């Protein structure tokens, strides 16, 4: 890994292909220094993509991109990953320079009904968002092409339908995003050999934690080591969890670079040379 100004560059390629900006990384709730989960992905010949859209993400997005220009990819529908989207509905409908076309929205099977209910001004009704979004549902392991990027969703271990995402550009540069998950074989497969693994680490390690919910720093490091990733970026750390302890746990299991992301950081993902 080498450091660039103003971005951190990951890998040893000669051309920057994919950039990911942290719009929010606080786990489970909005934190004092960060919105909940949200990541802006930019690549050549590809419209800007926002992965997850938790509380506060719309405000952070305005510092980095035009909200009317983005398409949205949701890992799952827990509130801290999607409930700033009704604000984007308003932006796309009522901004004086609102876009004429629809944005793409990918997510779990009940995305349309769940977000429509959240956006509706009336209880028991669904806001029909088909005027502003073209909604698609993930299918496990079925690739989706958006611009120059190939995105492969994988079902992971979480109480609700939840997907990790593997994103690859034409050069072979690869990023895996865990979403929310417990430790599972699918997560290791998702991250196998990627250049960058953006992985949740919601708590420090303890046998008392329930299974199939979240990862500890220890488990994030174990998955990174088993998958043979090049660099581990930790995210989704709640305000009540020690970042330093989570980082130390991950480093004890994974001997590659480990970093806990913060809001507004941008990382460049490059294929191993």
From Swiss-Prot:
GO terms for cellular component: plasma membrane. Disulfide bonds: none annotated. One of its GO terms (molecular function) is 3'-tRNA processing endoribonuclease activity. Signal peptide: none annotated. InterPro entries: cyc_nuc_deg_phdiest, Metallo-B-lactamas, RibonucZ/Hydroxyglut_hydro. Pfam families: Lactamase_B_2 (PF12706). SUPFAM superfamilies: Metallo-hydrolase/oxidoreductase. Belongs to the AtsA family. Was identified as a high-confidence drug target. NCBIfam families: cyc_nuc_deg_phdiest (NF041851). This is Uncharacterized protein Rv1339. The lineage of its organism: Bacteria, Bacillati, Actinomycetota, Actinomycetes, Mycobacteriales.
